[in-house]
């Protein structure tokens, strides 16, 4: 099956998580007016008294055409990925309780100035870079037993 890749927007992505960006977001000044703070752009949620981790993930570019075979989810915490050098990347998401609901499967491409924060329990494809090796600032839950993986019927990304 072919999966159409759409431009990422908060409206289109809201069921799956938060879009982390400054475009069309409110801010206030701090540090004597030298800094614009775009405050509270995503909800970081961590359950079971674990701690929040800040990491850097260095992702390799996917081979094209990319065929998807599995999705994962994290029931005990949100997971955010923010490209550190303005790189475009693709995210694939789905809703579903015990297994991904393929009727909700969506693919989005960022504009190079966006990150994403997946809600808890949102199915998503494992992180990959798009055109070149990409470093992602990653905010997620420390601890074990927080990753469910499910196979899905083959899906090939299709760009308009």
Curated annotation (Swiss-Prot):
Keywords of the record, alphabetical order, are: Lyase, Purine metabolism
Q: Is Lyase tagged as a keyword?
A: yes
Enzyme class, broadest EC rank: lyase
> So, what pathway does this thing act in?
Nitrogen metabolism; (S)-allantoin degradation
Q: Which GO terms describe its biological process?
A: allantoin catabolic process; purine nucleobase catabolic process
Superkingdom of this entry's organism?
Bacteria
Give the matching InterPro entries.
RmlC_Cupin_sf, UAH_cupin, Ureidogly_lyase, Ureidogly_lyase_bac, Ureidoglycolate_lyase_dom_sf
Record-listed E.C. numbers: 4.3.2.3
State if Lyase is listed as a keyword.
Answer: yes
Per the record, what are the reactions this protein catalyses? (S)-ureidoglycolate = urea + glyoxylate
Cofactor(s) the protein requires to work: Ni(2+)
Q: Which GO MF terms does the UniProt record name?
A: ureidoglycolate hydrolase activity; ureidoglycolate lyase activity
Family affiliation: Belongs to the ureidoglycolate lyase family.
Q: What does this protein do?
A: Catalyzes the catabolism of the allantoin degradation intermediate (S)-ureidoglycolate, generating urea and glyoxylate. Involved in the anaerobic utilization of allantoin as sole nitrogen source. Reinforces the induction of genes involved in the degradation of allantoin and glyoxylate by producing glyoxylate.
The protein's assembly and partners = Homodimer.
According to UniProt, the name of this protein is Ureidoglycolate lyase
The species is Escherichia coli (strain SMS-3-5 / SECEC)
Gene name linked to the record: allA
